[in-house]
From Swiss-Prot:
GO MF terms held by the record: GMP reductase activity
Source domain of life: Bacteria
Name of the gene: guaC
Annotated active site: C175 (thioimidate intermediate)
EC code: 1.7.1.7
PANTHER family per UniProt: GMP REDUCTASE (PTHR43170:SF5)
Name used for this protein in its record: GMP reductase
Organism: Oceanobacillus iheyensis (strain DSM 14371 / CIP 107618 / JCM 11309 / KCTC 3954 / HTE831)
The UniProt record lists the keyword Oxidoreductase: yes
UniProt keyword terms in alphabetical order: NADP, Oxidoreductase
C-alpha cells in the first residue's frame, strides 16, 4: 500500500464557480430505485436510530437503515412503514435465525426495499451465503453488504449479488476494533475507500471516521455514493439514549455496536461508550450538512454532487486543521 492517507490529510482544490448562490447546488443522490436528499445515512446503531427517527427520515426523503438489535420488532417495523407508504430499510446479521427471518418475509410478501447485511468483518463466507439467500427469496430487495476494507472483498460481495458494499473496519469514534485486534481501516479510512471504489462496479457506502461535514465531500471525491455517519448524528434531541446533565451541560450517551452496553455482556467487546454534547434538533444538523455540501459543490465548480468527484486534491499530512476548531 502506498499513498496512505485519511480525511485530515486531504484538502480538495477549488474549481471555477458556476453558480450565483450555493442554494442552486443539488445534493441529491440515487441509491437503488430511489433518490434521496443527501448522500448521508445515520449509522444503524442503537443510540443513533430508532423507529421514530427512521419514519421522520423517510418522510423527509433522507435515506435510513434501521438497526438489527431488536430483531423481534422488525416485522412490525416493515408493516408500519408500508402502511405509511414509506420505504423500508432494515438490517440483518448472519446467524441461523436470520435465514428463517428472510424466508418469513418472503412468505408474508413483506418485501423490504433495502436490506443491509451488517457484520463487523463482512468479507466472509457467512455474508456471501446470506447475500445469495436474500437474492433467492427477496430478489427485488436492494442488498447492502458489509463491512469490508479491501478491493477483493468488494468484488466478492458484488459477485455474490450485493447491490452495494459498505466500507470501513473500525474507524468509528466508538469503535475499538483497531485497538483490540490490530486490524482495520482506522487512520487510513479515506485511502481504503479510494482503493475499494476503484474495484467496485456498484455503489459504495463509506462507513466510519467522519468527523466534519467536509469529510462527506471528501468521501464523495474518493468514490462513495453514500456516507454513513455515527458520532455527528449522536446526541440529538430525538436520539435514543438518556439525556443527562453534567456540570450544567446536557449530554447524551453514544455507544458502539459491539460494546458491552449494546450486547448486555462483556464478551468480544469491540465498541465503547462515550457521552456527547446534546446537539439540539436532528433537522438542524441535516440542514447544516446540506448547506455545507452545497458549498462543497460550488467550490467543486458544478451544480450536482458529481462535480466533487472530479476535483484535484493535495495531501497535507495531518496539518490542515492547525488546531482549528469549528466551535
Amino acid at each position: 500500500m502506498e499513498n496512505v492517507f485519511d480525511y485530515e490529510d486531504i484538502q480538495l482544490i477549488p474549481a471555477k464557480c458556476v453558480v450565483n448562490s450555493r442554494s442552486e447546488c443539488d445534493t441529491s443522490v440515487t441509491l437503488g430505485n430511489r433518490t434521496f436528499k443527501l448522500p448521508v445515512v445515520p449509522a444503524n446503531m442503537q443510540t443513533i436510530i430508532d423507529e421514530k427517527i427512521a419514519k421522520y427520515l423517510a418522510e423527509k426523503n433522507y435515506f435510513y437503515i434501521m438497526h438489527r438489535f431488536e430483531p423481534e420488532k422488525r416485522i412490525d417495523f416493515i408493516q408500519d412503514m408500508q402502511e405509511y407508504n414509506l420505504f423500508t430499510s432494515i438490517s440483518v446479521g448472519v446467524k441461523e435465525e436470520e435465514y428463517t427471518f428472510i424466508e418469513d418475509l418472503a412468505a408474508k410478501q413483506l418485501i423490504p426495499d433495502y436490506i443491509t447485511i451488517d457484520i463487523a468483518h463482512g468479507h466472509s463466507d457467512a455474508v456471501i451465503k446470506m447475500i445469495k439467500h436474500i437474492k433467492n427469496n427477496l430478489p427485488s430487495s436492494f442488498v447492502i453488504a458489509g463491512n469490508v476494507g479491501t478491493p477483493e472483498a468488494v468484488r466478492e460481495l458484488e459477485n455474490a449479488g450485493a447491490d452495494a458494499t459498505k466500507v470501513g473496519i473500525g474507524p468509528g469514534k466508538v469503535c475499538i476494533t483497531k485497538i483490540k485486534t490490530g486490524f482495520g481501516t482506522g487512520g487510513w479510512q479515506l485511502a481504503a475507500l479510494r482503493w475499494c471504489a476503484k474495484a467496485a462496479s456498484k455503489p459504495i457506502i463509506a462507513d466510519g471516521g467522519i468527523r466534519t461535514h467536509g469529510d462527506i465531500a471528501k468521501s464523495i471525491r474518493f468514490g462513495a455514493s453514500m456516507v454513513m455517519i455515527g458520532s455527528l448524528f449522536a446526541g440529538h434531541e430525538e436520539s435514543p439514549g438518556e439525556t443527562i446533565e453534567q456540570d450544567g451541560k446536557k449530554i447524551k450517551e453514544y455507544f458502539g455496536s459491539a460494546s458491552e452496553f449494546q450486547k448486555g455482556e462483556k464478551k468480544n467487546v469491540e465498541g465503547k461508550k462515550m457521552y456527547v454534547e446534546h446537539k439540539g434538533p436532528l433537522q438542524d444538523t441535516l440542514t447544516e450538512m446540506e448547506q455545507d455540501l452545497q458549498s462543497s459543490i460550488s467550490y467543486a465548480g458544478g451544480k450536482q454532487l458529481d462535480a466533487i468527484r472530479n476535483v484535484d486534491y493535495v495531501v497535507v499530512k495531518n496539518s490542515i486543521f492547525n488546531g482549528d476548531k469549528v466551535f
